[in-house]
Amino acid sequence: MGAHASVTDTNILSGLESNATGVTAFSMPGWQLALWATAYLALVLVAVTGNATVIWIILAHERMRTVTNYFIINLALADLCMAAFNATFNFIYASHNIWYFGSTFCYFQNLFPVTAMFVSIYSMTAIAADRYMAIVHPFQPRLSAPSTKAVIAVIWLVALALASPQCFYSTITVDQGATKCVVAWPNDNGGKMLLLYHLVVFVLIYFLPLVVMFAAYSVIGLTLWKRAVPRHQAHGANLRHLQAKKKFVKAMVLVVVTFAICWLPYHLYFILGTFQEDIYYRKFIQQVYLALFWLAMSSTMYNPIIYCCLNHRFRSGFRLAFRCCPWGTPTEEDRLELTHTPSISRRVNRCHTKETLFMTGDMTHSEATNGQVGGPQDGEPAGP
């Protein structure tokens, strides 16, 4: 995604790939560059640390290894990669207007970080679909561990396929002594191919996934808030179970809304720019791009914060992960949250448990047919 008229940076939706023939010198005062560098450094540190911690919390604690949380791992990994590669190298490129990293890394930067962006949005969509099936259709078969891994593999393959055109047409050019990593679209008279690619990507990785997630979470919300725990069960584990489901929906809706807000200005920047390319030659456009790019990349650091604030198990996990910090002292309750698996069936009789699991959408197909209560995955949600 191009920073300005003279540069085509290595993110998705490159602004001036094949049409950047002139060079405009973009420079900024040292203090301004230092401020931007500090802002991007803070973003990368928070995003990488937060998402790495989320991955550790889930993988290191068996209770957290649920179908939904495996998708959250995939989302966290994608966000971590976006922060480490997109935010870091594209900031250097956009702020200096020179590609320092060679031709091989130019291809890599136009493939892997772009793939990670696709994986991020599709992982959120998979989480919405999984929760939709679990809550709205609790008697339908749930994804098994092998099926979940297969879905994750398909997500990565589809993301690679969508990112491959930008990688395929990547090339290194030297313009007035400055090395550029550009995406040179073939036979792109009038920028029609560029605009088409922008629109296709916008629809496939922004508009359609958001529509699907909005519809799924709307139905989930209506389903959960319509159901009420019977009076004789309106306390203890059953009520906590329903409340946990509602908190999960709130957390994931916040994740989706945050993503939508962060990325919309960035997508519009490039779509609108195809209609008025001379704007990329304006001196101020570098600052506009750096601001919009920071906003888009900042979406990678918010999810761990949301999980920590809205889910007690992730909050306990963060305390354990940062137990060396003054504010991260874990308690015995925090350890139990991540290691102890309560048995709902010990608290209530089987038929009442079965009814409650149906209402909260956590009954698997085998439980519905055999009257069995499942393990950690099928009790109080371990996810956010």
Swiss-Prot record:
One of its GO terms (molecular function) is substance K receptor activity. The chain crosses the membrane at residues 33-56, 70-90, 108-129, 150-170, 197-218, 252-272, 291-310. It is found in: Cell membrane. GO terms for biological process: intestine smooth muscle contraction; negative regulation of luteinizing hormone secretion; operant conditioning; positive regulation of acetylcholine secretion, neurotransmission; positive regulation of flagellated sperm motility; positive regulation of monoatomic ion transport; positive regulation of uterine smooth muscle contraction; positive regulation of vascular permeability. Residues 57-69, 130-149, 219-251, 311-384 are cytoplasmic. Glycans are attached at N19. It comes from the Eukaryota. Residues 365-384 are annotated as: Disordered. GO terms for cellular component: plasma membrane; sperm head; sperm midpiece. Belongs to the G-protein coupled receptor 1 family. This is a receptor for the tachykinin neuropeptide substance K (neurokinin A). It is associated with G proteins that activate a phosphatidylinositol-calcium second messenger system. The rank order of affinity of this receptor to tachykinins is: substance K > neuromedin-K > substance P. This is Substance-K receptor. It comes from Mus musculus.
